[in-house]
From Swiss-Prot:
Residues 370-436 form the J domain. Residues 1-42 form the signal peptide. TPR repeats lie at residues 50-83, 85-117, 130-164, 166-198, 199-232, 245-278, 283-316, 318-350. Interacts with the helicase domain of the tobamovirus (TMV) and the tobacco etch virus (TEV) replicases. This is DnaJ protein P58IPK homolog. Plays an important positive role in viral symptom development and is required for viral multiplication and pathogenesis. Disulfide bonds: none annotated. The gene is P58IPK. The keyword Transmembrane helix does not apply.
Length: 482
């Protein structure tokens, strides 16, 4: 037990001594660092002098690493304020960034060392041209003179200031107004390669993808921007606007599939109204609205919607098909055949070919005489109504009763008789209603029937007796009896 106490006491004394030793060593090390710091700084300054910084900046400029070059030039000037060439190169780099005021100051500083230097004077003139061109391009953009604005940006500003973010973003805006969305995507790609967190570039690139109807990629750009700045108003507007459009479109499509056609039609209209300029997406919305309108039997609405779709994409086969269906509803047979024939030539879809056959049949039927119309009756008229109409019109247009306009009366009378020959026969009437061809159905009284054929030549008299029947008179009235 006594030995244990002795050992414990010795252990405590040893640990305490070790702790004091470590504290002393740390204190000495800290003092050494403080004493050596000025020497280290001096050595650093000697290791990278102004000339070396200038040379490194020159190499960075060659590979277009302008930000690195600017840092080294600033350091070189700080190390040697009399290094005139550093001012000249810094002025040039600042001009590249379109930091025109700072650039001009550096040129002027260089000219204090090298008064009248032709290269500096030339670049200073280019600076003024670029600055003026950028201001002009901005004004032209505001006044919607897009072509001229692009010319100033491309041919002046970006020639003398190729690293000018302001000019690059202005160019993207001009391309967006010109609806050159692929060009806008390409240009913003260069900007984001240099600065992946450029919020304006993310917004513009997202909008370009949006207007190409590449909504997933557009959404990703908006989301990245909002992660960097959750309160960015334009990014929020673009992001939530896209979400609303997608939601409304899906609802319209779902309701169309469920047969809720009236609701679907209204939702398609609302989706289109959210962004009337979004043609790449609206072409599909107009087509959806056209289909729903045709299913509702709204021929005029369907025609208008499909016209809008075809104004955007004249080769959209399904829009041609649906417009043909809308024209069938409007009884524009020739227009329907034209649209459906064009669609069928570019598609093997059996539904389109069936619709074309239906349209061609309707067109053919429309060119035949409408026997119902000639007798002034409906297509659902009974046989007794047909006979009654025939008797009335035959009496009205009998040539003997129309001596003053005999030729017209004979033509009308012939049509009336032909109409009765078709509609008074159940089989012929059914075939006519189905659109089938009947021999001589539309010509010269139908089936060779001529109420004026019989005894006697021209000028014969026509007599009708309606008592107990309606036989032809002395002029050989074809023997129709009831």
């Amino acid at each position: 037990m006594d030995l244990f106490r002795v050992w414990s006491g010795m252990d405590f004394l040893a640990w305490r001594g070790m702790a004091y030793t470590l504290l002393l060593l740390n204190f000495v090390f800290a003092c050494q660092l403080l004493l050596l710091q000025p020497l280290v700084s001096a050595l650093d300054g000697q290791s990278v002098d102004a000339a070396e910084l200038f040379e490194r900046a020159s190499q960075s400029i060659k590979v277009k690493r302008y930000s690195d070059a600017l840092d080294d030039l600033n350091a070189a000037i700080e190390a040697d304020p009399a290094l005139s060439e550093a001012y000249f190169k810094r002025a040039s780099v600042l001009r590249h960034f379109c930091r025109y005021e700072d650039s001009e100051n550096s040129y002027q500083k260089y000219l204090e060392f090298k008064s009248g230097d032709s290269n500096a004077e030339k670049e200073l003139s280019q600076l003024h041209q670029a600055k003026s061109a950028l201001e002009t391009a901005s004004t032209l953009y505001e006044s919607k003179d897009i072509a001229k604005a692009l010319e100033f940006v491309d041919k002046v500003v970006l020639v003398f200031s190729p690293a000018c973010s302001k000019a690059k973003l202005l160019k993207v805006k001009l391309l967006m107004v010109s609806k050159d969305y692929s060009g806008a995507i390409s240009e913003t790609g260069y900007i984001l390669k240099e600065d992946e967190n450029n919020l304006e570039a993310l917004l513009l690139r997202g909008r370009a993808y949006y207007y190409l109807a590449d909504h997933d990629i557009a959404q990703r750009h908006y989301q990245k921007g909002l992660r960097l700045d959750p309160e960015h108003s334009e990014l929020k507007k673009a992001y939530f606007g896209l979400k609303k459009l997608l939601k409304k479109t899906k609802s319209a499509e779902d309701n169309a599939n469920k047969g809720k056609l009236r609701v679907s039609a209204e939702e398609y209209k609302e989706a289109i109204a959210l962004d009337p300029e979004h043609t790449a997406n609206n072409v599909h919305l107009y087509l959806g609205l056209c289909k729903v309108s045709v299913r509702l039997g709204r021929g005029k609405d369907g025609l208008n919607s499909c016209n809008e779709a075809l104004n955007i994409d004249a080769e959209l086969i399904e829009a041609l098909h649906q417009r043909g269906e809308a024209k069938l509803l409007l009884e524009d047979w020739e227009g329907a055949v034209e649209d459906l024939k064009q669609a069928a030539q570019n598609s093997q879809d059996m539904e389109i070919h069936e619709s074309l056959g239906k349209a061609e049949k309707a067109l053919k039927m429309s060119k035949r005489k409408d026997w119902y119309k000639i007798l002034g009756i409906s297509r659902t008229a009974s046989i007794s109504e047909i006979k009654k109409a025939y008797k009335k019109l035959a009496l009205q247009w009998h040539p003997d009763k129309n001596v003053g306009n005999r030729e017209e009366a004979e033509n009308k009378f012939r049509e009336i008789a032909a109409a009765y020959e078709i509609l008074g026969d159940d089989d012929k009437r059914a075939r006519f209603d189905r659109g089938e061809d009947l021999e001589d159905m539309g010509g010269g009284g139908g089936g060779g029937y001529n109420p004026f054929h019989g005894g006697g030549g021209g000028g014969q008299q026509y007599t009708f007796h309606f008592e107990g029947g309606f036989p032809g008179g002395g002029g050989g009235f074809g023997g129709f009896g009831f």
